[in-house]
Regions:
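Well-ordered beta-strand segments characteristic of repetitive beta-sheet solenoids
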Residues: 31-34, 45, 55-59, 78-79, ...
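Consensus "Asn ladder" position of solenoid repeat domains
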Residues: 106, 131, 154, 159, ...
Length: 451
């Protein structure tokens, strides 16, 4: 173990320890250790894995703090891995010199607006455990190419950029678990311009990632989890977002979970499951645009200023067994599907708690220019103007639902509405406590509904 104090570091929070830490990296055994104390550094500590051998950065049970006063990452872990996660693609030198760089039990703080926490490139099997990064720009910054990353039991807190930033990186296999990722101005977990596969986000608290706690810094559209594949050659597939608390304060253009794709022939984001989460308090709680093959199930999704779930230009989205409502009187609720096809909504409950209908005037479940949508076994209560409101839709099937207005003074105009143009729509075997509104140019067949 290379104790940085043995290489000249003071750890008193006053003396600049940059050169002492660099000396420990160059001459030590690879296990960089910071005893309890506060260590000032003014420049990046580069750890070239190919020349240093297996490496680690550790503090003393969380009592060690490194303060970065310069620009750039406090620590850069740079490897040479250009293969995949397949054992046959990993060169012997990677196993011998570079595998599993580990960071644990240490805190980082920034005193420069352009300081980052950790930057990783070319690494194989990197591990973060028990790490705090605060008051930096980006907390953990993954660039270029990495494989098999594990991040657990970490605090990425109150940074001016992104907590965990996958930035134009080719990365397969990454697990993020049991961590707090909160109050980061540009997002909690953000993926842009990258090729990512096998991402698991499980058991985390991801909250309040917007500009509201950052004083005069500019506010930008953000999300707790942001996946953006609009750049050329970027793609994200095989993602699990399970068992997290994902909430915020509403911000302009904000979302709790946002997945975006451009309209072209490239592979859209898909093979994504969002399950068993508590998601709430943003402009749009879940916003999907251009996705293909996403499942949203078993979530509590609450309190929006626009929609709980907004789906645009998407295909094969399965929405099942979720609960949608507002949580505070100033917020709203509801789902909206636009220009989407081959989707199902089943086993969901949607409830408008407002006395007079939502300020937005939105129905609980809206469809616009959609095709082949199955709505089955849902309970929609107190929707105004309608429980289900479809415009310019075809092949929409509403079956086995209960749609009612339970208010003493009803505010709903009806249970279901079809307007614009459309063909082969059906409403069957539902319990409806309001009328069905059908425009003349929409084909809707009714069968065995209880009114």
């Amino acid at each position: 173990m290379s104790d940085v104090r043995q290489f000249g570091a003071k750890g008193d929070g006053i003396i600049d320890d940059t050169e002492a830490v660099r000396h420990a990296v160059k001459k030590g055994d690879g296990a960089l250790f910071f005893p309890s104390g506060t260590y000032l550094i003014s420049g990046t500590i580069n750890i070239p894995l190919s020349t240093r051998g297996p490496s680690a950065i550790s503090g003393e049970s969380g009592t060690s703090t490194v303060i970065m006063t310069g620009e750039g990452p406090a620590f850069r872990l740079a490897g040479a891995h250009q293969g995949t996660g397949d054992p046959g693609s990993v060169k012997p030198a990677i196993w011998n010199q570079e595998r599993m760089p580990t960071v644990q039990n240490i805190a980082l703080e920034g005193k420069n607006p352009n300081a980052d926490g950790f930057e990783l490139l070319g690494t194989m099997q990197s591990v973060f455990d028990g790490v705090m990064v605060r008051r930096m720009r980006h907390g953990i910054h993954l660039v270029k190419r990495n494989r098999n990353v594990v991040i657990s039991n970490c605090h990425l807190y109150h940074n001016t950029g992104v907590g965990l930033y996958l930035d134009r990186v080719n990365l397969h296999q990454i697990n993020v678990s049991n961590s707090h990722i909160s109050y980061n101005r540009l997002g909690g977990i953000r993926i842009e311009g990258s090729e990512v596969r096998n991402l698991q986000i499980t058991g985390n608290d991801i909250e309040y990632n917007n500009a509201k706690t950052h004083g005069k810094l500019d506010s930008e559209p953000t999300a707790e989890i942001w996946i953006d594949t609009t750049d050329p050659d970027s793609s994200v597939n095989e993602v699990t977002i399970n068992s997290n608390t994902i909430q915020a304060t509403s911000s302009a253009g904000g979302a709790n979970i946002r997945i975006l794709e451009k309209e072209d022939e490239s592979r859209p984001p898909g093979l994504i499951t969002i399950s068993g989460n508590v998601i709430g308090s943003q402009e749009n709680n879940v916003h999907l645009s251009g996705v293909y093959g996403v499942t949203i199930s078993g979530n509590i999704i609450y309190s929006c200023t626009n929609r709980n779930l907004l789906i645009e230009n998407s295909r094969l989205v399965t929405v099942g067994s979720n609960h949608f409502r507002r949580h505070t009187p100033s917020r709203g609720t509801g789902m909206r599907l636009v220009s989407s096809e081959d989707c199902t909504v089943s086993g969901c409950t949607l409830h408008d708690e407002s006395e007079n209908g939502q300020e937005s005037g939105a129905s609980l479940l809206e469809l616009e220019k959609c095709q082949r949508i199955a709505i089955t076994g849902c309970v929609l209560t107190d929707g105004a103007p309608y429980g289900i409101d479809a415009a310019d839709c075809s092949d929409v099937r509403v079956t086995g639902c209960i749609i009612t207005d339970k208010r003493k003074v009803q505010k709903s105009r009806g249970a279901v509405s079809f307007t614009g143009k459309g063909k082969r729509n059906g409403v069957a075997s539902n319990n409806l406590s309001g009328k069905i509104n059908i425009s003349p140019e929409v084909e809707v067949k009714l069968n065995e509904n209880i009114n």
